[in-house]
Amino acid sequence: MIRKVLLSVLLAVLMTINLGQASPEVMKNLCMNYGKAMDQCKQELNLPDSVIADLYNFWKDDYVMTDRLAGCAINCLSTKLDIVDPDGNLHHGNAKEFAMKHGADDGMAHELVDIIHGCEKSSPPNDDKCIKTMDIAMCFKKEIHKLNWVPNMDLVVGEVLAEV
């Protein structure tokens, strides 16, 4: 279950990679593709629009998610993308494959999975998987900021709207 949360964090945020200036571009691609199932998750979980705003604001350096439904949305997206196994654990191969399919090289994909595992281990215990996912996501965001891999969400939204 905890690994599922990490995977969800990876996906929720998982949109990036290529150890250098290309990393924000890779993260943008990861984010765009991670979010493609959002309409389905929004409907299944009856998510309010405020959750979408939470996820949009997620990458802002000083933004802190507080709505547990955002964690639920990340869990839903990760499940839809088969980044977690049937037991809810992070599926390393699928997570790495997802990252590489959307622009990450082997090193970046491996580092993303490692970051999620580190965040999973350092996050406080919580029986509420949605809250646990939010904790892991916030840790993941912090680590991505340290690497300067943060995607430009205005570009992500612009490209998503262009596809619609």
From Swiss-Prot:
GO terms for molecular function: pheromone binding. Gene3D superfamilies: Pheromone/general odorant binding protein domain (1.10.238.20). Transmembrane segments: none annotated. GO terms for biological process: response to pheromone. This is Pheromone-binding protein 2. Belongs to the PBP/GOBP family. CDD domains: PBP_GOBP. InterPro entries: Odorant/phero-bd_Lep, PBP/GOBP, PBP_GOBP_sf. It comes from Antheraea pernyi. Antenna. SMART domains: PhBP. Disulfide bonds join 41-76, 72-130, 119-139. This major soluble protein in olfactory sensilla of male moths might serve to solubilize the extremely hydrophobic pheromone molecules and to transport pheromone through the aqueous lymph to receptors located on olfactory cilia. Residues 1-22 form the signal peptide. Keywords: Disulfide bond, Pheromone response, Pheromone-binding, Signal, Transport.
